[in-house]
Amino acid sequence: MATTIKVAVTQAEPIWLDLQASIQKAVSLVHEAASNGAKIVAFSETWAPGYPGWCWARPVDPALNTKYAYNSLTANSPEMEQLQQAAKEDSIAVVIGFSERSSSGSLYIGQAIISPQGEVALQRRKLKPTHMERTIFGDGSGPDLNCVAELDFGSELGSIKVGTLNCWEHAQPLLKFHEIQQGVVIHIAMWPPIDPYPGVEFPGLWSMTADGCQNLSQTFAVESGAFVLHCTAVCNESGIEAMDTRNGMVFREPGGGHSCVIGPDGRRLTQPLADKPSAEGIVYADLDLTRVVTNKSFQDIVGHYSRPDLLWLSYDKEKKDAAVHRN
């Protein structure tokens, strides 16, 4: 059985605030990745219909919030079916982030892992939106602790466990531990467009910059011993104009793209797409899965390098609904 799988990490700009157009572009990128031999293609956080960067520019924007809601993806929707069909046609796994609109109208930071057979193998919500994101998105619940799906890549590669988390979920130690104990081998770290670190005088948080976010993805690789597809989007002038973020905390100038592939020991395996983070494209890498086994022999934090007699994780996967019938 083969032990090498080719993966694709997008670094692309969505069609801002336009769900149908963003999904059409995503399908095109899926086909492009598959035509180049990839078996997994990764997209960034809320790639459809784009990350709502205005939440970091002003306290509230009712008009944009409303437009965003109308362009958010719903479960079992035609847009999801388009992605499933593309995955099935090309026999490629699709891991994508999106804004999810629930039946009640609330929005959530959603993720889906679609199998090469075109089935939604996993759909989850970000457990706790980060800071200003909470002005738009709600919290996930118990079932969203599930963040790993076992995908069938056929007789050549067999089954591989693929996992995903959103953005600063990579700063949540217990959540990361929970994913690692699910046996993740290839992890997709979804991030929005992120700006480079401008220097020590920067008034914001280093951990929100490209350097800081990549550091969190690399840390997850070291902790898990898994390959990490570090996926960021791009925000160019069209996004800045659509969201009016030029004077905000993020998305002030074109850029945001810093996608890469990270090995299970934490090293970066790929080069930047171009000199400018505003460049769009796809990062490719061939992953030798035997390296996961090698790293596990040194460090397995849920196995031989753990002390469950002293420290352990307890969790509750029950969904917490707003209305519950009691007899």
Curated annotation (Swiss-Prot):
Optimum pH is 8.0-8.5. Its EC number is 3.5.5.1, 3.5.5.5. Disulfide bonds: none annotated. The active site is at 45 (proton acceptor), 126, 167 (nucleophile). It is an enzyme of class 3 (hydrolase). GO terms for molecular function: arylacetonitrilase activity. Keywords: Hydrolase. InterPro entries: C-N_Hydrolase, C-N_Hydrolase_sf, Nitrilases_CHs. It comes from the Eukaryota. The keyword Hydrolase applies. It catalyses: a nitrile + 2 H2O = a carboxylate + NH4(+); 4-chlorophenylacetonitrile + 2 H2O = 4-chlorophenylacetate + NH4(+). CDD domains: nitrilases_CHs. Optimum temperature is 38 degrees Celsius. Residues 5-289 form the CN hydrolase domain. PANTHER family: ARYLACETONITRILASE, NITRILASE. Belongs to the carbon-nitrogen hydrolase superfamily. Nitrilase family. Nitrilase that hydrolyzes preferentially phenylacetonitrile, but also (R,S)-mandelonitrile, and 2-phenylpropionitrile. This is Arylacetonitrilase. It comes from Neurospora crassa (strain ATCC 24698 / 74-OR23-1A / CBS 708.71 / DSM 1257 / FGSC 987).
